[in-house]
Amino acid sequence: MGEFKFQLVTLLKKNSLLKGKSKIKFIGEILAPMIVIGILFGLLYLSAIIQPDFSPRYASGFTEVVGRLKKLLVATNGPLVPYQQTIVNNLRKQIKLAHPDYTNEYIDQCFEIFQDFESMQGYFLDPENYRGVMGGLWFDENDYRYNAPKVLKYSISVDADYTNDNNIQISPRSDSQIYLRHYFTQIQTAVDQAIFMAQNVEIPMVVTGQRFPNPYIHLWQTWTDGRNMILKETGGIFITAAIFVGLFTTITNMVMEKESKILEAMKIMGLHSLPYYVSIAISSCYTIIPSTIIVIVVLKGSQLIWTTQWYILTIILILFSISLILLAFILSKFFNRSKFAGLVCFLIVLIMAGIGIAVNHINVSTTVKLIFCLLSPVAISLANYSMSMKDLELVKIVNPDWSIIVSENQVIGMLILDVVLYAALVWYIDNIISGEFGQSKPFYFFLTKSYWCKKNANENDLVDLSKAIESPLYLRKKDLDYNNSQDFELNEIHSSKATIQIRKLRKEFKTGDGKRVAVDDLSIDMYQDRIHCFLGPNGSGKSTTIGMLTGLITCTRGSALINGLDINQNIDLIRKNIGVVLQQDIIWDNLTVLEHLIFYAQLKGYSNLKEAKTEAKKMGIEVGLELKLHNKAGTLSGGQKRKLCLGIAFIGPNSNILFLDEVSSGLDPLSRSEVQDFIISKKKGKTIILSTHYMDEADLLGDTISIIAHGKLKCNGSPLFLKNRFGVGYLLTITKKSTEFNKDSVMEITNKYIKQAHILSDAGTELSIRLPMESLPMFSQYFKHLEDCKNQLLIDSYGISISTLEEVFLKIGQETLKSTPNFNDPAVKEALSTKSSGVKVGQQLKGLLIKRICTTKKDFKSFMFSIVVPLIILALGLVMYKNMRTIETFNDVTTPLTFSIDDYGDNIYVPWSISGQNQAIDLRIKNSIGKSNHSKLLPADELEDYLTLNYEGNPGAFAFGKTIIEDIEMLSFKVYYNRDYLHALPIYINFVDNLMLSNLGGVGIQTTSRPFQHIKSKFELATEKINFSAIIFFIILTLAAFALVVASHAGNIAQERAARIKRLLYISGLKKYVYWLSNLIWDYVLTFIMVIFLAVVVVIIDSKFRNQFPLFICALVLFVTAIIPLSYLFSYCWSSHGKATGFIFGIHFGIGLLMTVTCFILRIWVIKDDNDILQTITDIIDLVFFFFSPFYCFSKVMVIISNFPGTTRLGESYIANYWGIKFGLPPVCFLALHTLVWTIWIMVLDYYPELRGKYRKGRNEKSSPPPPSDEDSDVSHERSKVLSFETSNDPIIMRDFFKLYKGKGKAKDNLAVYNTSLSIPKGQTFGLLGLNGAGKSTTLGCLSGEVIPSGGEIFVNGFNIQTQRLDALRSVGFCHQYNSLIGLLSAREQIRLYCRIKGIEESKIQETVEAFIKMMDLGSIGNSNVAGYSGGNKRKVALSVAIVGNPSVCFLDEVSAGVDPVVARFMWNVITELKKDKVIILTTHSMLECSAVCDRLTIMKSGKMMCLGSIQHIKDKFGSGYSIDVKFKKEYLLSGINLFQKELPNAKLVDHHDLSASFELPNSLDSPIQLSKIFSIIERNLKPILNDYSVGQTSIDHIFLKLTNLNQQKIKNQQKESIENHIIDINNNNNNNNNNSYLKNHKKTTSNNSILTNNSTTKNFGSSNFLDLESDNTYLNNLKYLEDDDFNIEMPPYQNSLKKSF
């Protein structure tokens, strides 16, 4: 538990740092949920602010309407009978009384009399009449003529839509105020008053109608409409989106950590899955908690959710948030690439929430619904529905069946179950699905004993071979299955512990060609305190073996014990002691170096933060990053990143097993030297497994060397054993002076003295000859002859060494690999000489289109997501558009309805009151109303309170009072009506009038509503055949589908840019517009699948789109052509496919949706309000939206074609011309404009460097800085030649060129390349050497056009790279350091593509491709995707891409970085063969490579050229005779240097690593030293103390070290570290040593040597004297020297205590 807590805290700190470093992203994660909730709240708020009118409105007022505005139609069956005529006349009297100025003739015109209902309705339905009609009065019976019947029946007719549905009595929130608004009650009260007059009952009344006092006076009640229409249905989706949107980045980052191996690297170094997931969950809460709080505050604080308690809602949302986090973990496990992970997971979760909406409405038991709740988004939708229904039930809006509704408590139970289930699934899936990396357990792992009963590591678990010779795990000859067991050094007893024991380890991979064995039954032991080096060709199985040992890869068969624990069963325990450096950097770009080291220090065991910081700083200094501790890792160079990874591996108190996989790959000599020193200094107490391609590094560091090929162990032993076994003597290395060098002449002289001599290799400018050991006595004569004939034989220099590991490797490699390309093959010769026939646009376009076809075909998942998923979304939209039920927005029910209070039941009581101010009237009213059994008299001042409290079940009430109008006192009669009762208002008017007239006049009144047929309004006519919802959903889903597909296309562009594929294509001669044209064409083709599908289906299913097909297809095509280039532009904002796709989709869809919904709302308002001003404003808004979004342009066209309400102009009933200026033409024109603008913009953006270069030429150019005063004479001479135009015909010319990077903010400017003038003639290979940051890559970038120079001129092939970039790069090849290969193409497809890019004739492409495949020995893998190639094979493909087409200039950036010596020599031969007719510029960190292939070179430092010339010239100028490299025997580690300098007094120590040392032996002209004499001294006097040595002219390595200031201070530091780390070991060795004779003979001499005295001009640190000094005082003086000198060494404790005791 303690370890869990500690790892958790450490991870949380790291996560917090990462979030803190990405403030903008973090703010976006916080704002995104707020925006989602803001949209929900906005919709709800709009519904809440539209509240009904609770003020009284006149129900009478007939006389104010009729005549002045409207006519009243009157009809009966036949002519009006007298009594009916009396009623009509009384209506006329009412008008006359109200308007005395009206003439009788005018009043007569206010009425139209008909003799049947049909005639009256026909008049009303006439479009010319209906606007002037108030309504109709129909007398049902005409069998009475003079006397009134007992019940006078009449019907009122108005437009059916001006009444409520006569078939329904009660409907929540429907309201009967409609009868007030459309003159029904005005007619009713006037006719009733006319009947009163006919019966001589004179009671003038003013009737008003008023809704019941608002019972929903509380905040929670004001949301009722929004709750019912929005929250109840879609609330679950909004809540899910708001919370899960914060997990989008979490999922993407998790998958990216898995994809980049960071996660597995952390696990390898001891991280457990549980704290990792818990830390991610807690870190997710940084965004989830605010999101959840916002949701709770909005829902509960605003009282959207009322009935449900705070704590219930909080529990539900907390559980739901936890479940979403766990669900995100589950979903992320199914993605190995971050490409679409975040977006797909987001869509999946939203779909789950959408399923919840459907589950709410299906009529099944709660048990079934609870099963659906196993998906937590479904559960939140059900919970939201239940909570909303409870609130709606309180206001009687719904009457739910609770037996089929899941309750909140049930949801809480299911969410708890979900959390537990999801947590178990995370645990289970994490174990059985490892993804691309890591070990997968069997599906039944939890049933195995080994999983639950872990074995603990202890001392007894370690196999001590000194006591267990017969152990089954002990490696003996009988354990070896190899044919040549003599190639294996078997140590029967070893003093160290066997910490790693590998037995029969095997790994098989499934490939398209069947199974491929990567590691073939490997068995080997590795020991503590030793460095075990894995060597082998690329793809030999080294990294796979390390992967299996660290748990990164699952074993197919076999096993290994690490510290006594089985890797197949106890990998988690093993990892507690492991440190690892993978080939891929396991760092976060936004964390600093110090933050990385602190994090890993704490992760690996330093619980105290202060202690972790101290160790982190110490480690940062030890790996050479003391000046970069506070720099972000993303700003470090490649070498510095490797150093950081090295520090990460070694930091921690328990990192005792170290796996270093090509740790020094790509490092410059300085960095590599520092790394080697560091590894040596840390060896004690550790087992280090190192894989490398540097043989000198393996020789220097390795205690044991294992060489693997094709997964098999070829040999194993100490470096000395392997050299003796495979070297068989000495290696003579001759450097050729020119191409005329004749190796046969050299061999003739050699064989004259040494018969058994033979050529080992002939690569580039180096010839290696094997000299047998027994020929040693002939060396003096042989070298004397060789020296005499040196110039004649065209020998530049030569050196001799005892067999090297490189030789061993080459010898073994020759058995398994091809190391020399067959240049004599006619096909190869033809391929190498095949030149471009001229760049052809059509050919380039063809090549790029084939590339896109191949990558699309091979990346099926991406195709599914980018095309198939959008097609599904599109199909869903079409299905909804076709099948969604049309909802009528008007009432067309004409069924008559007779109003009666009895419709509300026999037990209904009508509350009423009377003011009591006129006793006579009050009495008459009481007598009339009191007769009813339904009435209930209340005090006037209590009525409204009563209605408020008794809202439910009361259809209506009324109150009598008085009012004064124009000094006339009149009876006031107010009807209160309940909103939920559709016809309450006319019913209660009829109820009162009927009772009063029955009591006072003896006649009853029966009023009936007999609606006219509905006359559709403009809006209704516009929507008559339109399905609102269908159109809206169709358009939204269409926008989503196209947004998704173009976002995916943009992701591909972002990926190619980030991988530098686009740059390589441009440098190779691709015309930029062809690149964009090819992408546009292919993306158009893919997108037009959707276009065709949409066009065909929509035309088939919908006549409107069929009729306007030209407009629709034109808009659709232009829409696609506009959004793709716009998406390309957006892609520049992101460097990963996944983030580009997700964010671009969000931008497109979000903006398009927002603008489209705004359009819907505005257009509906325009037509409903019939508002010309609003229409003009909306037109302007349209134009603004057209300008900003092509998505809105297309949605507008769809809106127009679908005849969405408001698309027609006011006053028009249809669209006469869909292409009109107010309709389809503007959006189509804007779409065309978008297409043009965005396409041109991406071109301009890409052509900007050329345009800028042409503009800057001669304008505002910065003057080059003056040449340095101490400039080398050769560099100065070259400058003079270039400036005097003596080299104007050379292919490469740099004239006063420099590059200045401007510092941002307070950062200083960085002059990356100083004033440089250089020319390179044809046929020359030019080497650029220098430390990281010296300016090599910047120089190469400027030469290739990637980087714009700050000043000066650069000419390539005679063209200015700034102003004539395309011409300059027409015949240029580039091999980038980062390969820049297309992973989904095979080697053949890759080379074929660049053949077309470079303009090779189509008829020659196939043979050229096959020739390159043959030359590069790629035949067996030529059809496999490059992504699966080893590093060496990738470099072969990259080199092929660079040289295909026989370019005149080749830039090779670290061409052999990370490849084994066999492949490296292979490449050197290729380069040597190619350079005959071209310029090759090579950057490299390999001095051996430079010596082998370069004709001329420069060493750069701080942007300046420190030297210039051929290798021999630089050796002659900066070298000083001979260089001697030696490797001492272990017992002479400290004394060897002094002993060596004793025999060769003039030898200067140049470099020192552990047992190895490099000396420089000056060779003055006065007394030159012969090579034969040097050999004689070494063989005679120094041989007993040496394991190995080599002698030669001063190497370029030594000169490099000298010119880059790798000087004496470094030597002192190296010696200091050697003393600290080896003094104990050597003392132990010395105690066990019998003092060999050589040491005895020299002891007196060495003891008299002062530690401060040296024959060399440099103060030498006499570490060797520690063993030879005879007195303790001398030893302590040495300690004092160490302490007082400028080394500032922190002495080991035992030394300090010893010193104090004296």
Swiss-Prot record:
GO terms for molecular function: ABC-type transporter activity; ATP binding; ATP hydrolysis activity; ATPase-coupled transmembrane transporter activity; lipid transporter activity. One of its GO terms (biological process) is sorocarp morphogenesis. Pfam families: ABC2_membrane_3, ABC_tran. Coiled coil: none annotated. It comes from the Eukaryota. It is a multi-pass membrane protein. It is found in: Membrane. Keywords: ATP-binding, Membrane, Nucleotide-binding, Repeat, Transmembrane, Transmembrane helix, Transport. Belongs to the ABC transporter superfamily. ABCA family. This is ABC transporter A family member 3. It comes from Dictyostelium discoideum (Social amoeba). The gene is abcA3.
